[in-house]
């Protein structure tokens, strides 16, 4: 992996977290980062921007910084940094440390980030956030999910002014007509830059007297549990399968089994439908919902409250890179069953390292004879990975496209 970001006479060491699992061809920044850095540095050098470094002066806000490149570059401006991704947060943390922009200690990521000039907010926290002073500049890395962009623009309506410069950056293929329409709808007149290295900037000018729109999120739909009862499922903007039950989860619901005393992990939980279904099957089970998306975890929490509010104390909601957070605990939970529908994207890159790490972490966390149950497309051939790690896997159910595999820790 290329880790040396050399640009405009500066050099930063930047990694994609978790570094040890990344393909050598990947790096922690792209041309969209370079383009917005170049633009802002030009404005700063010509004194066309006035950005303060304390809460009572106009600030810089950064949204969706994939691996912390923008947060590190502009750390001297004490920006607010907003992300829905735990992995992005960990990347920012590691990169701030690598470039001596944060005090290293024996503390946790959260504790060390408190010493950083970069003020971090999760996407869930940012929904109710309002700075003391309107930001001078808002930089948005256009996300894959336009619903997330829509929610962020609605949130911004609460505190930006016509003097705020709203600048988005992204690959040309990400800057679609639909994305531009969102800026026009929620912010104001919108233009774009010329393309450079397959990236482009968006410039949106806030209208006078912006009124905050009503958010269309969370979206709500219903599905049937394994026992046939209706489950009410809410989905915040950046939640996988936001509009309907995905096919893999549907097959899992048809074939799930959970025992009364199980400690269940819903790994990569999304809206938590599998974990909520586990509570319907075994009301006394403990369920740990794990995801790297803060909106997913909040959706899962809402869905426990929607369907089994008296079981909320049996549930835990953990932001983590796969099962890393649980494995690093001094007192690890005695997990007997892990339910997993692995993703195969990290930000905009297609990768199989997430599935590998999920399976490896599951092997390490499960108690002896504990079970991992995986659903996935047939062509992903998860049975090969599971055989290497667990010694084999059994087909529990299948259709033309999907397969459910089960394996046990020996």
Curated annotation (Swiss-Prot):
The family database entries (InterPro entries) matched by this protein are listed as: DNA_methylase_N6_adenine_CS, rRNA_m2G-MeTrfase_RlmG, RsmC/RlmG, SAM-dependent_MTases_sf, Small_mtfrase_dom
Question: What catalytic reaction does the record list?
Answer: guanosine(1835) in 23S rRNA + S-adenosyl-L-methionine = N(2)-methylguanosine(1835) in 23S rRNA + S-adenosyl-L-homocysteine + H(+)
Is S-adenosyl-L-methionine among the key words of this record? yes
Q: Which UniProt keywords apply?
A: Cytoplasm, Methyltransferase, rRNA processing, S-adenosyl-L-methionine, Transferase
- EC numbers listed for it are 2.1.1.174
UniProt key word RNA-binding: no
Using the UniProt record, name the top-level EC class of this enzyme in a single word.
Answer: transferase
Superkingdom is Bacteria
Q: Which GO terms describe its cellular component?
A: cytoplasm
Annotated Gene Ontology MF terms?
A: 23S rRNA (guanine(1835)-N(2))-methyltransferase activity; nucleic acid binding
Localization of this protein: Cytoplasm
Where mainly located?
Answer: cytoplasm
Which family does the record assign?
A: Belongs to the methyltransferase superfamily. RlmG family.
Q: What does this protein do?
A: Specifically methylates the guanine in position 1835 (m2G1835) of 23S rRNA.
Q: What is this protein called?
A: Ribosomal RNA large subunit methyltransferase G
């Amino acid at each position: 992996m290329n880790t040396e970001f050399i640009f405009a006479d500066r050099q930063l060491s930047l990694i994609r977290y978790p570094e040890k699992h990344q393909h050598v061809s990947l790096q922690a920044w792209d041309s969209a980062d370079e383009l917005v850095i170049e633009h802002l540095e030009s404005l700063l050098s010509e004194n066309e921007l006035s950005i303060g470094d304390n809460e009572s002066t106009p600030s810089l806000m950064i949204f969706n910084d994939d691996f912390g490149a923008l947060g590190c570059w502009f750390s001297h401006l004490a920006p607010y940094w907003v992300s829905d991704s735990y992995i992005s947060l960990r990347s920012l943390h590691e990169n701030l440390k690598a470039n001596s922009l944060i005090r290293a200690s024996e503390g946790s990521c959260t504790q060390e980030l408190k010493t950083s000039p970069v003020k971090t907010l999760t996407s869930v926290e940012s929904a109710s956030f309002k700075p003391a002073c309107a930001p001078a500049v808002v930089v948005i890395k256009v996300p894959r999910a336009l619903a997330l962009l829509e929610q962020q623009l609605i949130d911004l309506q609460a505190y930006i002014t016509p003097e705020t410069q709203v600048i988005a950056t992204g690959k040309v293929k990400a800057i679609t007509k639909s994305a531009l329409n969102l800026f026009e709808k929620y912010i104001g007149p919108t233009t774009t830059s010329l393309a450079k290295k397959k990236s482009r900037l968006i410039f949106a000018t806030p209208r006078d007297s912006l009124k905050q729109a009503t958010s269309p999120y969370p979206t709500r739909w219903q599905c049937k549990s394994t026992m046939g009862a209706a489950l009410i499922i809410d989905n915040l903007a950046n939640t996988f399968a936001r509009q309907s039950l995905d096919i893999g989860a549907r097959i899992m619901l048809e074939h799930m089994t959970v025992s009364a005393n199980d400690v269940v992990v819903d790994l990569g939980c999304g809206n938590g439908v599998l974990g909520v279904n586990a509570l319907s099957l075994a009301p006394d089970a403990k369920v740990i919902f794990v995801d790297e998306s803060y909106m997913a975890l909040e959706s899962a929490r809402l869905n426990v409250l929607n369907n089994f509010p008296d079981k909320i104390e049996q549930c835990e909601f953990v932001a983590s890179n796969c099962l890393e957070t649980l494995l690093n605990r001094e007192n690890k939970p005695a997990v007997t069953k892990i339910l997993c529908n692995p993703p195969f994207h990290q930000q905009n890159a297609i990768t199989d390292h997430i599935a590998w790490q999920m399976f490896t972490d599951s092997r390490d966390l499960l108690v002896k004879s504990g079970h991992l149950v995986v659903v996935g497309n047939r062509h992903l051939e998860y049975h090969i990975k599971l055989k290497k790690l667990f010694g084999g896997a059994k087909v529990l159910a299948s259709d033309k496209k999907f397969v459910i595999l089960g394996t046990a820790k020996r």
